[in-house]
Amino acid sequence: MGKTQPLPILITGGGRRIGLALAWHFINQKQPVIVSYRTHYPAIDGLIKAGAQCIQADFSTNDGVMAFADEVLKSTHGLRAILHNASAWMAEKPGAPLTDVLACMMQIHVNTPYLLNHALERLLRGHGHAASDIIHFTDYVVERGSDKHIAYAASKAALDNMTRSFARKLAPEVKVNSIAPSLILFNEHDDAEYRQQALNKSLMKTAPGEKEVIDLVDYLLTSCFVTGRSLPLDGGRHLR
């Protein structure tokens, strides 16, 4: 008998930065990957060439979320994991209607994972004890709050709470955890002054890069016991 093909890992927002790094990590392990993307960055073509299934999706509406879920349901009979990496960053600022800011942040960080977890639940079940995973990417600000990104922090806090609720709902077949990062890597346009200020916010005074996230994701995927937890990835920032 031939070797059974592994079930794919679904990564939302997999076209750039951490999502892209995770996609390549799994591809290099011969792990099938399904990636959602909103904007067709050149990196998407590389993922497709490497064998990833890339599905364009618009998570700004519930209809867009459910249309994406339908595409996933058509494409596979099961999932190894869902990594909710898709995110947006919007501040309260003059000229931006507060209702729009809150609605946008809640849509991408709460509605989207909530609807996808429900719609794709059957793809995660039936594979054995602790055989499947959901990982929510939240944020360090869940613990501290943010005076400049109030809606963003609130939406990530709601996602953090959903981690525990879905862990209760889906155990023991599916483990559900969240990762709460602070600074992981800089943007190309960040200047030296900003970078130094950001580094000084943590005890470790470094931006560790995508590998730190990948290692933590691997830990959660291989654990048979950890569920309903938020794992901080902040370099001791809470002690500053």
UniProtKB/Swiss-Prot annotation:
Gene3D superfamilies: NAD(P)-binding Rossmann-like Domain
Matches recorded under InterPro entries: NAD(P)-bd_dom_sf (IPR036291), Sc_DH/Rdtase_CS (IPR020904), SDR_fam (IPR002347)
GO BP terms: one-carbon metabolic process
Reaction it catalyzes: (6S)-5,6,7,8-tetrahydrofolate + NADP(+) = 7,8-dihydrofolate + NADPH + H(+); 7,8-dihydromonapterin + NADPH + H(+) = 5,6,7,8-tetrahydromonapterin + NADP(+)
Chain coiled-coil ranges: none
Residues annotated as catalytic: 152
Documented EC number(s): 1.5.1.50, 1.5.1.3
Keywords: NADP, One-carbon metabolism, Oxidoreductase
GO molecular function: dihydrofolate reductase activity
Domain of life where this protein originates: Bacteria
Family of the protein in this entry: Belongs to the short-chain dehydrogenases/reductases (SDR) family. FolM subfamily.
Known function: Catalyzes the reduction of dihydromonapterin to tetrahydromonapterin. Also has lower activity with dihydrofolate.
Protein name per the record: Dihydromonapterin reductase
Annotated gene: folM
